[in-house]
Amino acid sequence: RKLAFRYRRVKEIYNTYKNNVGGLLGPAKREAWLQLRAEIEALTDSWLTLALKALTLIHSRTNCVNILVTTTQLIPALAKVLLYGLGVVFPIENIYSATKIGKESCFERIIQRFGRKVV
């Protein structure tokens, strides 16, 4: 029960701040975070902006969804998604952590959920 409550709370926080992670950080950390994101953009030739543009296009299509499979543990992965501003294109239900169960199990779950005819 504790675990179920914890995950419900995590989902609530994720959904509350997926459009406004700055609200979760507070003013001082928000400014540092924005500066860091600007530096990352400059050093990576706007990689994040371009990735977000592609993911937003996919997310806007009615028959398409973005799915994230990571080897990072779930809670740190969700934090990274929020910090990179990707929460708007990755619903929490579509983020899978392969840390404990492995990638193959994650993909089996995705196939069960969405079917085999996925791209």
From Swiss-Prot:
Which Gene3D superfamilies does the entry mention?
A: 3.40.50.12350
The answer on whether this UniProt entry bears the keyword Disulfide bond reads: no
Positions of disulphide bridges? none
GO molecular function terms listed in the Swiss-Prot or TrEMBL record: histone H2AXY142 phosphatase activity; protein serine/threonine phosphatase activity; protein tyrosine phosphatase activity
Localization per record: Cytoplasm; Nucleus
Main localization category: cytoplasm
Query: Keywords on this record?
Result: Activator, Chromatin regulator, Cytoplasm, Developmental protein, DNA damage, DNA repair, Hydrolase, Magnesium, Nucleus, Protein phosphatase, Transcription, Transcription regulation
Output the InterPro entries linked to this UniProt entry: EYA, EYA_dom_sf
Q: How, per the record, is the cofactor bound? A: Binds 1 Mg(2+) ion per subunit.
User: What EC numbers are recorded for this enzyme?
Assistant: 3.1.3.16, 3.1.3.48
Q: Which cofactor does it need?
A: Mg(2+)
Root EC class: hydrolase
Q: Quickly give the catalysed reaction.
A: O-phospho-L-tyrosyl-[protein] + H2O = L-tyrosyl-[protein] + phosphate; O-phospho-L-seryl-[protein] + H2O = L-seryl-[protein] + phosphate; O-phospho-L-threonyl-[protein] + H2O = L-threonyl-[protein] + phosphate
Q: Name one GO biological process term.
A: double-strand break repair
GO terms under cellular component: cytoplasm; nucleus
State the function annotated in the UniProt record.
Functions both as protein phosphatase and as transcriptional coactivator for SIX1, and probably also for other transcription factors of this family. Tyrosine phosphatase that dephosphorylates 'Tyr-142' of histone H2AX (H2AXY142ph) and promotes efficient DNA repair via the recruitment of DNA repair complexes containing MDC1. 'Tyr-142' phosphorylation of histone H2AX plays a central role in DNA repair and acts as a mark that distinguishes between apoptotic and repair responses to genotoxic stress.
Identify its protein family.
Answer: Belongs to the HAD-like hydrolase superfamily. EYA family.
Q: What is this protein called?
A: Protein phosphatase EYA1
Q: Which organism is it from?
A: Gallus gallus (Chicken)
